[in-house]
Amino acid sequence: MTHNGTDSTDLIIVGSGPAGIAAGVEATRHGLRVLLLDENAAAGGRVWQAIEARGAGDAEEDNGLAMIRELLISDARIHHGAEVWCIEPYGAGPGGTVFWNENGAARSARASRVLLATGAIERPMPIPGWTLPGVMTVGAAQIALKTAALVPDGNSWIAGQGPLIWLYAVQVLRAGGKLGGILDLSDTAARWRALPRARRAMPDIRKGLTWIDEIERAGIVPLRATSLQAEGRGALSRITFEVKGKKQTEAADLLLLHDGVIPSLQITRALGCGHVWHERQRYWRPVTDAWGETTVPGILAAGDGAGVGGAAAAVFSGRIAGLGCAHALGRIDGATRDREAAPLRLEREKALASRLFLDVLYAPRAFVPDDATLICRCEEVSAGQIREAAARGCQGLNQLKAFTRCGMGPCQGRMCGATAAEVLARARGMHTREIEPLHTRFPARPLTVGQLSELEQEP
């Protein structure tokens, strides 16, 4: 497919979070023509979302704001509100054509290199009652806080594990919001397993302890809990959980869940990129070389979309990918590329040091959702239906579509794929990495017939 007005450029970057911004700055600095596409209204991704409008809140956000401003004064062309729905790699060489929707119209552009900086998504956390109105993710609530200054009030609870629950709780309290409580669902034994990696993660550990201290000084004592359930008729009204084996019930009209993040793989899967299993955090990530290039020539991945490492590491991986593109397209020689990349690699390793600690401390907990718990919200497929399909011989997620329609709804498996794989693997007595992942296909976003008709078949 191609569009009558197909543009041509050196590098197209999909996503304007830390990795995409850094790659854009680095690539334009070396003379590449850069087109940056992002579905949000402004640059920053999730971690620096709406930072231009609300201002920086700490030193890390100061650095992010400075990078965004550097990108804005560069020669990069930036398109916001651009939803990428297809990428067609060149058959004869690296690069490809990118198709996206913008202002209701389909557009396309060609590039010698395409960098995917699509970030991460929250890991699904299907507890009983998670589909009730009043239950949402911490990430979604944080977006509401950053973009619209909306904060929880009344009987609002945070539950789960990972740094985000502590950061968000502090942000809520500083913004004048109220919390009923925080449930820490992490594994107590994981603290001891993570201890050998703590020394290199001390700056982040101190930051986390400062957050927890601020939360406790506000009168909120986090509870270490298990067996969480959301309950209510038509909407959330209470939560039940266990603390030291004793069941407790609390009134709640908002429950915010979080169980870490995993790479967003919809585009890399659809492109046919190779992927490798990350055992500690139980997710797939694209295979990349030292410069971020995937197994599809000319298609690169950087940042959390190439493996969750956090914002600081994403910045350095984006800059390294930008250098790789500049060399591949003849703007700098190999010696210059390697010399400039060397300190970036060292800084990235420093940034990733704390990630090794966090990966063990907040390793995904093995869970066994009861048969009635919905796994696929779009098609209303329960854990019990997945187990029944396994008993009937279902061997992978693509077969599961035929058995149950799991993964065939509007989200195309983004919300259920990881959980469905875990349930199916356990039911079949297999490791999750042995379960065939979903075969994702383009279009990656909803597309109208009218938008599609604006494109014509290439002769």
Where do the protein language model's features map onto the residues?
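Residues forming the flavin
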Residues: 2-410, 414-459
